[in-house]
C-alpha cells in the first residue's frame, strides 16, 4: 500500500467511473495503510449464495448481496475484510448475520470461495468482469473487461448465429 499503488487505483477507478458511470469514493486511498485483498469479499458472496440456497432463495438475492458489497467498498470506502462490514448487507438481503458470521469465519466458507476461484480458472477467466457464453458444452469468451451492452449483444449474436 504505497503512493504508486494508490495512484494506480485512483487512475483505474476514475477510468471505470468515466466509462461506466458507476460512482466511486476515494476515501480509502487516503488511508496510510490498507490491505487490498479481494478474497474476503469473494468469500462473503460465496457464503451468501450458500445461505440463500439453503433458504430456497434465487440468484437475484445473491446479486443484490454482491451489488451491496461493491457499493459499500467502492463508494463508501468501508473495509470488506472485517466481518461487521456485512451486517447491514445481511439485513438488506434477509440473511441472518449470525449464520453469515459463522460461515464467513469457517473453513467451509473459505473452501466455498476457493471453489469459486477454481471454477473461474477452469473456465479460463483471468480478469473481471468476464462474460462467457456456453452453448452445447462449448464456452465462448464474449468479453474480458468492461464492454458496452450493445457491443456485448453484437458479440453474443455473432457467436450464436455465425455467418455462413
Task: Indicate residue ranges for each PLM-predicted region.
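C-terminal cap of thioredoxin/glutaredoxin-like
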Residues: 54, 68-164
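Structural alpha/beta surface segment adjacent to cysteine/selenocysteine redox centers
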Residues: 1-72
Amino acid at each position: 500500500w504505497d503512493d504508486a499503488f494508490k495512484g494506480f487505483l485512483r487512475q483505474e477507478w476514475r477510468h471505470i467511473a468515466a466509462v461506466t458511470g458507476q460512482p466511486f469514493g476515494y476515501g480509502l486511498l487516503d488511508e496510510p495503510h490498507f490491505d487490498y485483498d479481494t478474497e474476503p469479499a469473494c468469500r462473503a458472496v460465496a457464503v451468501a449464495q450458500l445461505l440463500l440456497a439453503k433458504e430456497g432463495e434465487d440468484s437475484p438475492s445473491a446479486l443484490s448481496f454482491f451489488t451491496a458489497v461493491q457499493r459499500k467498498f467502492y463508494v463508501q470506502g468501508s473495509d470488506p475484510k472485517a466481518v461487521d462490514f456485512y451486517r447491514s448487507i445481511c439485513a438488506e438481503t434477509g440473511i441472518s448475520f449470525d449464520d453469515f458470521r459463522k460461515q464467513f469465519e469457517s473453513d467451509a466458507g473459505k473452501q466455498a470461495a476457493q471453489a469459486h476461484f477454481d471454477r473461474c480458472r477452469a473456465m479460463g477467466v483471468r480478469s473481471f468482469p468476464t462474460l462467457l457464453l456456453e452453448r452445447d458444452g462449448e464456452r465462448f469468451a464474449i468479453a474480458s473487461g468492461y464492454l458496452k451492452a450493445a457491443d456485448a449483444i453484437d458479440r453474443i449474436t455473432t457467436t450464436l448465429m455465425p455467418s455462413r
